[in-house]
């Protein structure tokens, strides 16, 4: 459980005396810590740093085997001895010193606490995190602790070891952070920056991204802010960021990369109390550089470089984890780079690092927030450019990123509102497409965002790390319980997510239900309609069909057992159609597709590819194919999406727009992380060639994949053209599961003659549906009807202007209409929706005696 830390920034420095609120603790907690003790003696008379644990629960806790550390990379530096019991409501003091021996009857951890700040971690015997706190610079005999004991509020205190933490112990004086004379941002020319802080404080600062301490440069006068892009590369010169083999190399840029000046500053008072860290990223002279600096969001991530590149704790490097493997018994020279253990392959809370994030739009600062960052991904962690997960947490400051990361383009399916608040998000490196177009996944998901499946919002940005150009990233919604909550209005505690056939979010109960479904579909006879009905009660079939159709069309070969996700609400809520307890599906990481590497060809039969796999999706799809209803509905859904979502003209237009938007970012990013390999600078011609691969795939995919569909479904008919015409000023129409785009005139799609199509017309106010004109040969008068296809055919919805009061829809208002409305009100008859519209003479969207009286007056006149 991540706890609230009082005003703690990403650097672990405190700016206020009392913290933000968070969830109350529910187990043993780290209650108080002191890093400069000169007043409280241990049993041997010495003055040690100390940590106090507290048990806020109503029962004793056995701490045997629990671990305590001040280095998250080394959990369990101190292990509590067997028999250590912390009574209910009790406190336990642990002294800290790297060299001293524990005084008789007291506990001693083999590490000291730094007066400049620490992160402390308590773990259970399995290594699972129990609690963590972080604090900044602490003065003499000042502690950092919970007020009151065990609460979720933190403050700097007059230390109270082994005694209750009380409000009167809270130090009332907080040190304000330094103020910069100009806001961080993009400026045409350099300038002198003035720093100011409260009287009686001293300002210390750094310009290399490192944590400022009292050992840093002391501020004595204005700081010259200038264009530093020509300065020597530092972080971007690192080559220990990935392993090498015959397929991959790590080459640092040979020329300086674009840079910004990074200023971090603290104010320290006479008692040694420190402010939070003030951070500023300044980019000078970018007005004539690449347009993507103006067209895209720019995100600056600032963290002490050790958090990324330290041998032991750095999350971006091969590091000690790699060397231990290379020098250990498990080393195998044939291991591929993406399978090699390394620091950057590690995951979980122990490998999260603090950072300060600033976001700029059009050169101006729009958000500044302290966050946590981790490396994201599977195999792509081994790439030179790595993806980040970004977390907002109370212990860094704000518990959410309250900012519209996606420019109003991501909306909730539940209420239609713009999603502009996030617990976390990804900065994705384009995955397997990182060295190619960098927009495959975005393209694929955007093409089906209107369907009944969950897609991820994405928006391109440019990232700088400690002031150095880190290239194009895609701001991406993170697959999590928050994603489901934001889109579907499901409480996070009720969300269950299965990812790659494992429980990703939620309770064990949800995983048990998934496992039971998996086992059942392996043997179930779904040709039995009763069994198919049972399946439909557990799985949203339209979501499943939409999801499978999309992945089959992409020819995503890194999918099936991998890169699959599904979710459900564990609680049924009548007022939320998505909280019905059914499994629905999530698209993510779709880029291993659309002719990537020349391997996922448009001619491939992706149905056969999936059915060869031994995985849940294969078993579920294979079982569902036994059922006639599913085969019919899947055939129509697949052809709907092939005709509309993947229409070549539509896809080509989208590719052209993305290609223009991404080309400069892609070239700059490739030459930042893969300069000179293979064969020199990544050229415009190479980018054009990669883009053409995607374009050609979608232009030629239809024929081969629809033929494969016919084989998979054992269809005997042929493909024929359905042309649909409609006057959209009179009404809207639906073909099967889609609303066709008629903005350009007639809509044309192809369907197999084996399965009838469903046509539905919905007249607008002032009109009523008359009939479907079927090839000028036939008229169908039902607004919703099934049409058997025998050959190419044109259909048109025909409407007439509605006549208010014409309840029986015969074109006249007469006594017959009065009688029909009266029978309806007496519950002796029914009305269709179209008839109800004509009967609502008062326009109040309900039928009652007032409508009957108005119709009677009309007839009398």
Segments predicted by a language model, with ranges:
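Bacterial N-terminal signal peptides
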Residues: 2-14
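Short, compositionally stereotyped local motifs that mark structural "simplifiers"
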Residues: 6-7, 21, 29, 33, ...
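Cellulosome-associated attachment modules in secreted, modular CAZymes
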Residues: 11-12, 16-17, 21, 796-861
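Activation on beta-sandwich/Ig-like modules and their edge loops
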Residues: 20-154, 215
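Second-shell loop/turn segments in exported
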Residues: 40-41, 427-436, 534-535, 620-622, ...
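Short, solvent-exposed loop/turn and secondary-structure capping segments
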Residues: 42-44, 64, 79, 104-107, ...
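Middle-to-C-terminal accessory/interaction subdomains
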Residues: 161-170, 295-322, 326-336, 344-347, ...
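Conserved ATP-binding subdomain of kinase catalytic cores across diverse folds
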Residues: 301, 327-512
């Amino acid at each position: 459980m991540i706890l609230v830390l009082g005003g703690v920034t990403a650097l672990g420095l405190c700016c206020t005396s009392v913290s933000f609120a968070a969830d109350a603790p529910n187990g043993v907690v780290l209650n108080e810590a002191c890093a400069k003790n000169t007043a409280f003696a241990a049993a041997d008379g010495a003055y040690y740093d100390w940590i106090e644990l507290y048990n806020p629960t109503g029962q004793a806790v056995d701490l045997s085997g629990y671990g305590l550390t001040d280095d998250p990379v080394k959990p369990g530096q101190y292990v509590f001895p067997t028999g250590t019991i912390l009574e209910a409501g009790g406190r336990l003091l642990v002294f800290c010193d790297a060299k001293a021996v524990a005084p008789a009857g007291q506990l001693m951890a083999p590490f000291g606490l730094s007066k400049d700040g620490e992160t402390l971690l308590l773990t259970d015997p399995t290594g699972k995190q129990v609690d963590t706190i972080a604090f900044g610079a602490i003065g003499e005999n000042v502690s950092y602790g919970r007020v009151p004991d065990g609460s979720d509020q933190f403050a700097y205190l007059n230390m109270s070891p082994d005694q209750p933490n009380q409000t009167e112990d809270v130090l009332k004086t907080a040190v304000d952070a330094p103020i910069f004379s100009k806001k961080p941002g993009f400026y045409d020319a350099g300038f002198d920056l003035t720093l100011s802080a409260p009287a009686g404080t001293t300002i210390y600062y750094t310009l290399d991204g490192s944590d400022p301490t009292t050992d840093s440069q002391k501020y004595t006068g204005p700081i010259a802010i200038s264009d530093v892009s020509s300065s020597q590369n530092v972080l971007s010169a690192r080559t220990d960021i990935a392993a090498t083999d015959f397929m991959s190399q790590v080459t640092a840029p040979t020329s300086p990369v674009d840079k910004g000046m990074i200023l971090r500053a603290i104010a320290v008072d006479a008692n040694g109390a420190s402010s939070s860290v003030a951070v500023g990223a300044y980019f000078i002279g970018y007005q004539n550089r690449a347009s993507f600096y103006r067209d895209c969001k720019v995100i600056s991530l600032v963290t002490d470089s050790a958090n990324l590149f330290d041998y032991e704790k750095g999350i971006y490097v091969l590091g000690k984890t790699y060397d231990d493997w290379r020098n250990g018994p498990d080393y195998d020279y044939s291991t591929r780079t993406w399978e090699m253990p390394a620091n950057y392959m590690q995951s979980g809370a122990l490998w999260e690092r603090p950072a300060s994030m600033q976001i700029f739009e059009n050169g101006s600062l729009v958000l500044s927030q302290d966050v946590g960052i981790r490396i994201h991904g599977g195999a792509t962690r081994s790439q030179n450019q790595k993806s980040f997960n970004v977390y907002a947490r109370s212990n860094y400051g704000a518990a959410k990123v309250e900012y519209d990361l996606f420019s109003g383009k991501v909306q909730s399916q539940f209420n239609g509102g713009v999603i502009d608040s996030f617990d976390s998000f990804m900065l994705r490196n384009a995955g397997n497409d990182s060295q190619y177009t960098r927009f495959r996944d975005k393209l694929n998901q955007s093409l089906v965002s209107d369907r009944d499946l969950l897609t991820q919002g994405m928006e391109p940005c440019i990232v700088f790390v400690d002031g150095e150009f880190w290239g194009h990233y895609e701001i991406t919604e993170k697959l999590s319980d928050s994603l489901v909550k934001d889109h579907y209005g499901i409480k996070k505690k009720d969300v269950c997510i299965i990812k790659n056939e494992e429980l990703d979010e939620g309770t064990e109960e949800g995983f048990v239900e998934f496992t039971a479904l998996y086992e059942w579909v392996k043997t179930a006879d779904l040709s039995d309609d009763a069994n198919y009905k049972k399946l439909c009660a557990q799985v949203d079939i339209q979501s499943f069909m939409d999801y499978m159709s999309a992945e089959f069309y992409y020819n995503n070969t890194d999918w099936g057992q991998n890169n699959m996700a599904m979710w459900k609400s564990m609680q049924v809520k009548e007022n939320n159609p998505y909280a019905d307890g059914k499994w629905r599906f999530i698209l993510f990481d779709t880029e291993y597709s659309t002719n990537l590497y020349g391997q996922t060809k448009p001619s491939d039969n992706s149905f056969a590819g999936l059915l060869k796999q031994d995985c849940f999706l294969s078993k579920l799809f294979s079982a569902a194919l036994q059922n006639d209803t599913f085969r019919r509905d899947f055939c129509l859904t697949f052809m709907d999406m092939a005709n509309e979502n993947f229409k070549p003209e539509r896809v080509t237009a989208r590719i052209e727009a993305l290609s223009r938007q991404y080309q400069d970012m892609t070239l700059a990013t490739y030459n930042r992380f893969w300069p000179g390999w293979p064969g020199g600078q990544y050229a415009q011609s190479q980018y054009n060639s990669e883009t053409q691969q995607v374009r050609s795939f979608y232009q030629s995919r239809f024929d081969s994949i629809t033929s494969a569909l016919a084989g998979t479904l054992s269809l005997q008919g042929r493909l024929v053209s359905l042309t649909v015409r409609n006057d959209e000023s009179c009404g809207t129409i639906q073909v099967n599961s889609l609303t066709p785009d008629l903005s350009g005139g007639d809509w044309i799609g192809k369907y197999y003659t084996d399965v009838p199509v469903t046509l539905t017309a919905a007249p607008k106010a002032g009109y009523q549906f008359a009939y479907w004109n079927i090839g000028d040969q036939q008229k169908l008068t039902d607004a919703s009807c099934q049409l058997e296809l025998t050959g190419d055919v044109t259909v048109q919805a025909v409407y007439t202007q509605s006549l208010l009061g014409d309840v029986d829809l015969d074109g006249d208002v007469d006594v017959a209409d009065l009688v029909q409305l009266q029978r309806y009100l007496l519950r002796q008859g029914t009305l269709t929706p179209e008839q109800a519209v004509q009967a609502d003479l008062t326009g109040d969207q309900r039928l009652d005696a007032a409508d009957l009286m108005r119709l009677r007056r009309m007839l009398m006149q």
